[in-house]
Structure formats: C-alpha cells, structure tokens
Amino acid sequence: MSVTFAQGFSAAGVAAGISSVEGKKDLALVVNNGPLDAAAGVFTSNRFCAAPVQWSRKVVADGHVKAVILNSGGANACTGEAGYAQSVATAETVAGLIGAEPNDVAVCSTGLIGELLPLDNVLAGAKSAHEALAATAEAGTDASHAIMTTDTKPKTVELTGSNGWKIGGMVKGSGMIAPQLATMLCVITTDAVVSAGQMQAALAVAAEHSFNRIAVDGCMSTNDTVLLLASGASGIEPDKDEFNKLVREACASLSRQIIGDGEGASHDIRITVTGATSEDAALACGRAVAASNLLKCAISGNDPNWGRIVSSLGTVPPEVAPYDSNKVTVDVNGVRICENGGAGRDRSEVDMTPREVHIDIDLNTGSDAEATVWTDDLTHEYVHINADYES
C-alpha cells in the first residue's frame, strides 16, 4: 500500500511520457487530505542541487505540504532559471487541481542531469494523476513504480503504532547512492496527530542513522529528497518516543531496501565498527571501508580480502579516529581473519555464499562507541547499467 497505508492520503502513478521508456509509469502524485497538513523534509547536500529541491526546500520550510508530485525520467538539475520555472509551474498546476496554493506543493524529480523536462507532458500527467487519485493499495503501488529509474523493484514500508496510528512510505534509489542522502526520492506518510516540529526532529535523526549511512557507489546526487507528511486522520496523538522509533524504523527499512536493490549488486555489505573513541570516529572508519572499490570488487569475487579492509581503514586521519593499528581486529561473517593488525584465521574459512556479508571491525581503543554503514559489492553489471544509462 505504500504511501496510502496511512489514513488521509491518496496517490496515483501514471505514464506521462517523461521517461525514454515507452509506456513506463513516470509521474506520481501523493495528496494529503487532512485534516492536518504537517510536513518535514531533508534534502541533498550537493551544491548543484536541482530546481525541484530548491523549490521544495522553500515549501517545507513552513511545515505544511498538501501534495507532492514526483517524476522519473529527468532530474531537472543544472537547468538554471528555466528549470526552476518548470518546478514552479508544476506546483501551480497541482495546486489548481487540488484547491491549494503553489507553496503547499512539493516537487521531486529524478533522472538524467542537465536537461529540462518535457513540461507539457509533466503538466498533462499531473492532470491524469489527479483524475486517478485513490486511497487504495493499488494506487500506492502505482506511485511507487512511477518514481523508479534503474530500480528493479518498488521499495515500500508499512508500520502500525501500538494504539493504531500508521506510517507508510515509498523510496526510489539503486545507484548514485552515497552518504548525506543519495539519488533517492522518499515520501513517508503518517495519520498520527503530530506537529511539524516534532516530525522534523524525528526525521533528522532517522535520516542520519539510515539514509546517511548507506553507500552503493559513493556518488552524491543533486536531487535527494525525503519528505514526511502527517494527515492526523487517525485522531491519535502518539507517544513521542514511539513516534520517533517508528519513523526511524521506516527509514531504516527503506534504506536497507535501497542497498538490497543496489545496481548490479550480488552482495549487501554491513560494516560495523566498534571500540571507537566516538560515534563520529566509528562512522568515519566505516565510511572509509565502504568507499573502497578494491574491497567491493573483492567481495564480488567472494574474496574476504582483509588487507583491503585495513588499508582503507588506515586512510582515516588519527585526529578523526585515534586507534592503534596493532590492536585492530577484523571479522568477516564471524571469522576473525585479522588479529591485532595482522593475519588471523585463513580467509578460506569465511563462508561468502550468503547475500549479506558482515564485516566487524574492533578498534579496541578501550572506548565503546560504534557505528554501522551499509554498501554493496561492485560487479560487471553495475558498469553495464551505468555505461548504458540515459534516463
């Protein structure tokens, strides 16, 4: 059901002729029918942020969003004033259809960078999507399909609070995934009665511990957007801690689904760093290992090459992550193949057949801070997908 799982939301996904793939659903519309229209958002940190990101940041700033229109088939990034005007025109069209103001409508785009969208198709698609709006499971599924690019499957989540309020969500993302968000569009909905301020606080923490801790290829997108919308339709004001927990669980589920659908990936790699002096230190170490293309290629070949793990770990400056390299241990899928900075058990003992590969690094500093990041291996198929990618 995706974004329609929570009460008070309707959605649609239609083929608007934006994508180069004929007949593909490429435009989604999500409408918050209230009674509340509270909203929160986090966006890309890329300095070349796309026109729809620039627009949607302004929309979300006042904590109110009545609708989100999303398209695949074109990023509308690096398109200057003309691209921004397209985002405004799109918001104006949707606002007119639902009886709202343009600054109540967030706009999201994903696809090829550097080209304007076929605006006539976008606006006509918005009207078609409005006509198709429904609060059904099928409508939510259609919306989740419409935002896909190189994704091989839709990614959705549905969670229910202890007293019946709900969270639903959808995300797209498969490649161009790096820390500080990624090439992903995500809409999460809830029918809980919550304020925009509470939502923003919950989403910021949830994103930091989920979307900001995955990396498929280390490439940061211009278009990342994560929106959290509340309709209040359940009439239930949730416990604050439970609300924060479920938002975090929703983001964790969606981010893991991105890793599970990484472009061409044959292994999902979980990297956990423990025994660090701080969480930031552990995170820096985990990200350094996750960024190693040499390691990712080795994992693709079912080789738990611990030398590539520690060589990447060693690139983290000591002022960022102090540790003694002679005390570091590395386990892969439960086998300690690096002991005290040197060889441990033979790496042939590691079972590399599971889809998930767990790399556990203990810095043994005497402190107990830790962090986990996720990445994928690097395969021939990843190169093939991105060599041929157009939109």
List the predicted regions and their residue ranges:
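A structural signal for small-residue-enriched, beta-sheet-centric alpha/beta enzyme cores
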Residues: 1-71, 75-85, 95-391
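Generic structural marker for isolated residues within well-ordered, non-membrane alpha-helices
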Residues: 91
